[in-house]
């Protein structure tokens, strides 16, 4: 197992990519903090995941911490330290993607998206990094960015800048935190079938068109991200920092 004796915080872990990542981290021996929004749906999803992890002999706790709350990172770190004594890995996954056209973008929607996807992430990364520095044995931070950090989207003008920002944050943090042995990397999912884009993918014609652009011939699934995230969290990636890993079935190179 790759993550034995490590404590891993995963934000947005009640469903989708975060859920798959948290589950696989637990399978690899980690003690997992399942971060969720605090909503009834988020709480239910996180608790069911904690039960699933316990069923195969893993260890996990569920913690409500809305990613839009700039203090959520401190809350997650405090919960991890209280329950498990340390923070070794942060997987910053929480994010929203409400599609909307540019010219009539509501200011509130823009601010909510940036607040959740980028501002919340910044301070969560900071909180985890401070704890890792204090512990004195390094650590790993993985941000779930997106292929949207590299390509535009007419209905995502409020979303793509946040994902580009996450990628840039990991690159800068790799430099800032390298002296403390803290590695910072980003994974860039392509089109992954999750709740966040369920409505967009419900159009079968559009779904088929999107699938046809992927060289591997299918859309991604949350579990497709779990392995790359575990790799970057583990000591197998001990000399990997400031990197960006596309997990898109070849979509980006095909778009080029």
UniProtKB/Swiss-Prot annotation:
Changing residue 191 to F: Retains 4% of wild-type activity with L-rhamnose as substrate. Keywords: NAD, NADP, Nucleotide-binding, Oxidoreductase, Rhamnose metabolism. SUPFAM superfamilies: NAD(P)-binding Rossmann-fold domains (SSF51735). Transmembrane segments: none annotated. GO terms for biological process: fatty acid biosynthetic process; rhamnose metabolic process. GO terms for molecular function: nucleotide binding; oxidoreductase activity, acting on the CH-OH group of donors, NAD or NADP as acceptor; quinone binding. InterPro entries: NAD(P)-bd_dom_sf, SDR_fam. Changing residue 37 to H: Increases specificity toward NAD(+). Shows a strong decrease in catalytic efficiency with NADP(+) and an increase in catalytic efficiency with NAD(+). Its EC number is 1.1.1.378. Beta-L-rhamnose binds at residues 146, 148, 156, 159, 191, 197. NAD(P)-dependent dehydrogenase that catalyzes the oxidation of L-rhamnose to L-rhamnono-1,4-lactone. Also shows high activity with L-lyxose and low activity with L-mannose and L-fucose. Can utilize either NAD(+) or NADP(+), with a strong preference for NADP(+). Catalyzes the first step in an alternative pathway for rhamnose utilization that does not involve phosphorylated intermediates. This is L-rhamnose 1-dehydrogenase (NAD(P)(+)). It comes from Azotobacter vinelandii (strain DJ / ATCC BAA-1303).
């Amino acid at each position: 197992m790759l993550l034995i004796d490590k404590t891993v915080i995963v934000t947005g872990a009640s469903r989708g990519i975060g859920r798959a990542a948290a589950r696989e981290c637990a399978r690899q021996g980690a003690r997992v903090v399942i971060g969720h929004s605090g909503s009834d749906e988020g709480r239910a999803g996180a608790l069911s995941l904690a039960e699933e992890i316990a069923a195969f002999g893993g260890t996990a706790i569920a913690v409500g911490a809305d990613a839009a709350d700039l203090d959520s990172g401190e809350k997650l770190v405090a919960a991890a330290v209280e329950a498990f004594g340390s923070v070794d890995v942060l997987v910053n996954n929480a994010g929203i993607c409400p599609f909307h056209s540019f010219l009539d973008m509501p200011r509130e929607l823009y601010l909510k998206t940036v607040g959740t996807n980028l501002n919340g992430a910044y301070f969560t990364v900071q909180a985890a990094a401070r704890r890792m520095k204090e512990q004195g044995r390094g650590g790993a931070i993985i941000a779930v960015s997106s292929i949207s950090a590299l390509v535009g989207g007419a209905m995502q003008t409020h979303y793509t800048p946040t994902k580009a920002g996450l990628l840039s944050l990991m690159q800068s943090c790799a430099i800032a935190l390298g002296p403390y042995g803290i590695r910072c990397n980003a994974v860039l999912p392509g089109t992954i079938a999750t709740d966040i884009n369920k409505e967009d993918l419900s159009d079968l014609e559009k779904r088929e068109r999107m699938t046809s652009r992927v060289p591997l011939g299918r859309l991604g699934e949350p579990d497709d991200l779990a392995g790359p995230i575990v790799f970057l969290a583990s000591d197998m990636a001990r000399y990997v920092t400031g990197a960006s890993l596309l997990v898109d079935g070849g979509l980006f190179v095909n778009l080029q």
